[in-house]
C-alpha cells in the first residue's frame, strides 16, 4: 500500500511534468527574451511562464538573508553536477511547508519540489543539479502561514543536461548510501542511478539515451515522514541529498525512492555507524547492511 501511494504520486507528477516540459519547450522555441528585474537579477520569458503556472497572483517576498539563502557557484566547474545549498534561519526552521527549486533555462526547469512535514526541523538542503545553459536558479519556499519567499542566483554554465554519462560506479542500480555527522544532525544520502536526461547521446552507438531518472524520494525518521521530494532530469547522475537539522535525526532514517520506470528502492540507516550502505532490488524491497 505504501509503495503504491508513492508510485501513484510519482506517476501524477510525471504526467504534469510532461505537460509543463512541452509548454516550456514551445516557449523556448518561440524565443525567450532576457531582461533585468528590479533586483538586477537576470530574468527570462521562461520564468515569467513558470511564475504564472506555479504562483499566479502570489507575492514572492524577500526577507533578509537570515531567513533563507540559496548558494550556487557563479561559474560551475561541472555543469552536470552543480552544487546547490538552501539554508533556513532560526525563524524559518519548522515553518517551511514546501520548497521548489527552479532552473529557468533547463529543458525541465523544476529540479525538485520538497514537501516538508509539519513541524519538521529542516535547516539546510544540499543537492546537485544539471545546468543546461546560462540561467537563474531559484528557490521558492511556501511557509506554514501561506506566505512565499524566493531567492535566486545566476549560474554561468552550459551542457549539463546533454553531458555524457560518467564512468559506471561500483555497485548496482538503486544502491543507497548514508553518511551521518557524528551528532546525527546532518545526513547525506546518495543513490546509484544514471538519472539520464533524455538529451544525452550514447558515445558508441550515436543514438539518444532514453530518459531514466529518479522521480520521487521520501525521507523518514523514526517512522515519521520528514519530507517528500518530487524530482526529475535536472538532478545530477547518482543523485545525492543532504539534510541538516538543528536537532539530531532520530534513527532509523529511511529512504524510499521511485524512478521513472517505476522501480522502487528503499534502505534504512540504524544509527550504529557513521556511514552505511544498503543494496536494493528494482521490485521495491530493500535491506540494510
For every predicted segment, state its role.
Residues 16-23:
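Sec-dependent N-terminal signal peptides
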Residues 30-32:
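N-terminal signal peptide c-region/cleavage motif recognized by signal peptidases
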Residues 1-15:
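N-terminal secretory signal peptides that target proteins for export/translocation
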Amino acid at each position: 500500500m505504501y509503495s503504491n501511494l508513492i508510485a501513484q504520486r510519482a506517476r501524477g507528477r510525471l504526467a504534469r511534468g510532461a505537460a509543463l516540459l512541452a509548454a516550456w519547450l514551445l516557449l523556448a522555441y518561440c524565443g525567450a527574451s532576457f531582461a533585468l528585474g528590479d533586483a538586477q537579477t537576470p530574468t527570462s520569458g521562461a520564468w515569467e511562464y513558470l511564475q504564472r503556472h506555479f504562483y499566479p497572483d502570489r507575492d514572492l517576498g524577500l526577507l533578509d538573508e537570515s531567513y533563507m539563502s540559496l548558494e550556487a557557484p557563479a561559474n560551475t566547474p561541472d555543469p552536470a553536477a552543480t552544487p546547490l545549498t538552501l539554508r533556513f534561519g532560526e525563524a524559518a526552521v519548522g515553518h517551511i511547508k514546501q520548497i521548489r527549486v527552479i532552473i529557468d533555462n533547463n529543458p525541465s526547469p523544476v529540479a525538485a519540489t520538497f514537501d516538508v512535514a509539519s513541524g519538521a526541523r529542516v535547516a539546510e538542503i544540499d543537492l546537485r543539479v544539471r545546468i543546461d545553459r546560462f540561467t537563474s536558479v531559484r528557490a521558492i519556499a511556501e511557509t506554514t502561514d501561506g506566505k512565499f519567499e524566493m531567492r535566486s542566483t545566476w549560474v554561468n554554465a552550459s551542457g549539463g543536461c546533454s553531458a555524457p554519462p560518467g564512468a559506471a560506479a561500483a555497485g548496482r542500480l538503486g544502491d543507497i548510501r548514508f553518511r551521518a555527522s557524528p551528532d546525527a544532525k546532518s545526513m547525506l544520502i546518495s543513490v546509484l542511478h544514471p538519472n539520464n536526461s533524455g538529451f544525452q547521446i550514447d558515445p558508441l552507438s550515436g543514438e539518444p539515451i532514453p530518459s531514466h531518472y529518479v522521480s520521487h524520494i521520501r525521507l523518514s525518521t523514526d517512522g515519521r515522514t520528514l519530507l517528500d521530494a518530487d524530482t526529475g532530469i535536472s538532478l545530477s547522475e547518482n543523485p545525492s541529498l543532504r539534510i541538516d537539522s538543528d536537532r539530531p535525526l532520530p534513527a532509523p532514517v529511511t529512504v524510499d525512492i521511485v524512478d521513472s520506470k517505476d522501480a522502487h528502492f528503499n534502505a534504512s540507516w540504524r544509527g550504529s555507524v557513521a556511514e552505511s550502505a544498503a543494496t536494493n532490488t528494482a521490485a521495491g524491497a530493500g535491506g540494510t547492511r
